[in-house]
Every structure is written in structure tokens, then in C-alpha cells.
């Protein structure tokens, strides 16, 4: 388990490129036949990926020991979105078939967590966010058909995008975790611009659907002290509450956003005008 400490905004603005990447970038999300796990002190979120290829991958008691409990979800909830081939997640003996862009919410208290791919040649890629939980809500599958997409932006400002809200109060009940998927229309490059912060939540982005010769310049920092991190395909970035989180790509891309904190109201954000950015 890779542990990332919290960092003050005054400290963050003094960091060079390598230090920024070390603090906020998660480079290796998917590793064949393993789970990856990054534990952030910021709202205690855990982020990672699971890619079963030649055999199922189980998250067992070894993780619980690192968290001071018996199992990962003794005091946590888990959200998973599959961006790879078809697969399944077995939760306490019950199999949930999870296709491409299907999602599964797993509530507090689940013990057995096994991840499988249907085909080794096209493995599932289970991306997950995991957050502290105070009560148990039912495990529930969410498919793209269950999500009412919202299209925002304009081709003229190169930010036309479709937002799919998977884990939000209108779709299912969670303790604090919110997750969704945003896809840019072809020829559009900007996400979340004009940008915002949200004092009551932190956020993590996973960028994907990117070609090998493309990248995203992820914008971060306080609005008057902006920095950037160059992102490649299937990499994630941690965004503290004080930081903007926006990006511009060399080509269109898709990203998964996950938020934890004290407020699940999607529109609870502090907007920043473009002319106020520095």
C-alpha cells in the first residue's frame, strides 16, 4: 500500500515538477493479476485498480491488517467502475457480472471480494475508490442505462462533454462516496473549465481512453497559484479540497471522477472565473 500524506497549499506551491508528481500523481493503476492501492490521508480515500488476467484477484485479510481491521470493508464502502473487458465481482459468494462501463457499489461490511475477467485476451479493468463509511448500504450494480447523462459545454470553447453520474444520491445511497464518468466529444479538449474548488470535498481523477502519443495537462493548485501535471493514459491524480482540478488534452479523452467528504450535493462548488486564474 502506497501512503500519501496530506499537504498544505502553501507547501504545494513550492514544489518542482518531480515533487508535484510524487505527491499527487498515481502512475500505475492497472497491473496484471494484482490490485494496486494508494491510501491518501486526504479524507482517507483509497484509490486503485484491479486487472485479473490469468487468474481471479482477491482483496483479502492482508489489506485489513494494514488498516487496523480484519477486512477492507469492515469500516469502508467501495465503488468500482470497469473500463476494460467484461468481468465479474464476487461479493460474499454472490456473483455480479460487470461489463464495460458497468459499475458496482459495495457497502460496508462485505467480506469476500473476488474480481475476475471473462477473457484473458481482453481483461476487465476495475477502477475503484474506497472511503470510510458509518453504516451499511446494499450492494448495487449501476449500468450506463441507469444513469441519466448530462451534456455540457460547447464546441466553440472546446469543452463539450457528457457527464454520467453513477454514484450520486439520485441513483443510490452511499455514506459519502460519489463517482461518475465524463467523456469529451471528439475534437474537444478541456474538462471542468471554467473551473472550481469545493471546500467540503476532495476529488480524484482517472484519465483514460487516451492514445499513446497524447497527454492531458491536468491543472491543479489554488486559483491564484496554478500548476500542472502531465498525465498519460490510465493514470490518476489526487486533488485536495483547496485545489482546482481541470485539464486540457492534446486529443479528446475520458475521465472518472470520485469525491469523498462531508457533502454529496454535486453542485456544491466554489466557481472560479477564468479571468481570476493565475
Swiss-Prot record:
Pfam families: KduI. Pathway: Glycan metabolism; pectin degradation; 2-dehydro-3-deoxy-D-gluconate from pectin: step 4/5. Its cofactor is Zn(2+). Keywords: Isomerase, Metal-binding, Zinc. It is an enzyme of class 5 (isomerase). Catalyzes the isomerization of 5-dehydro-4-deoxy-D-glucuronate to 3-deoxy-D-glycero-2,5-hexodiulosonate. This is 4-deoxy-L-threo-5-hexosulose-uronate ketol-isomerase. The lineage of its organism: Bacteria, Pseudomonadati, Pseudomonadota, Gammaproteobacteria, Enterobacterales. The gene is kduI.
Amino acid at each position: 500500500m502506497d501512503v500519501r500524506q496530506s499537504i498544505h497549499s502553501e507547501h504545494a506551491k513550492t514544489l518542482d515538477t518531480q515533487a508535484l508528481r510524487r505527491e499527487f500523481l498515481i502512475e500505475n493503476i492497472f497491473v496484471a493479476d494484482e490490485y494496486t492501492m494508494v491510501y491518501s490521508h486526504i479524507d482517507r480515500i483509497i484509490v486503485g485498480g484491479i486487472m485479473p488476467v490469468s487468474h481471479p484477484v482477491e482483496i483479502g485479510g492482508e489489506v485489513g491488517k494494514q488498516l487496523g481491521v480484519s477486512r477492507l470493508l469492515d469500516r469502508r464502502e467501495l465503488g468500482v467502475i470497469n473500463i476494460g473487458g467484461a468481468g465479474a465481482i464476487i461479493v460474499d459468494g454472490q456473483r455480479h457480472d460487470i461489463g464495460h462501463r458497468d459499475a458496482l457499489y459495495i457497502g460496508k461490511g462485505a467480506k469476500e471480494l473476488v474480481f475476475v475477467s471473462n477473457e484473458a485476451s481482453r481483461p476487465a479493468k476495475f477502477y475503484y475508490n474506497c472511503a470510510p463509511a458509518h453504516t451499511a448500504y446494499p450492494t448495487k450494480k449501476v449500468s450506463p442505462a441507469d444513469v441519466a447523462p448530462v451534456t455540457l459545454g460547447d464546441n466553440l470553447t472546446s469543452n463539450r462533454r457528457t457527464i454520467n453520474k453513477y454514484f450520486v444520491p439520485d441513483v443510490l445511497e452511499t455514506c459519502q462516496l460519489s463517482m461518475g464518468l465524463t467523456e469529451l466529444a471528439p475534437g474537444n479538449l478541456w474538462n471542468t473549465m471554467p473551473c472550481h474548488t469545493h471546500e467540503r470535498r476532495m476529488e480524484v481523477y482517472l484519465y483514460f481512453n487516451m492514445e499513446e502519443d497524447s497527454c492531458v495537462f491536468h491543472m491543479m493548485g489554488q486559483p491564484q497559484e496554478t500548476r500542472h501535471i502531465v498525465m498519460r493514459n490510465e493514470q490518476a491524480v489526487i486533488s485536495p479540497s483547496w485545489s482546482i482540478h481541470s485539464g486540457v488534452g492534446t486529443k479528446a479523452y475520458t475521465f472518472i471522477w470520485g469525491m469523498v467528504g462531508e457533502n454529496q450535493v454535486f453542485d456544491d462548488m466554489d466557481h472560479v472565473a477564468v479571468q481570476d486564474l493565475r
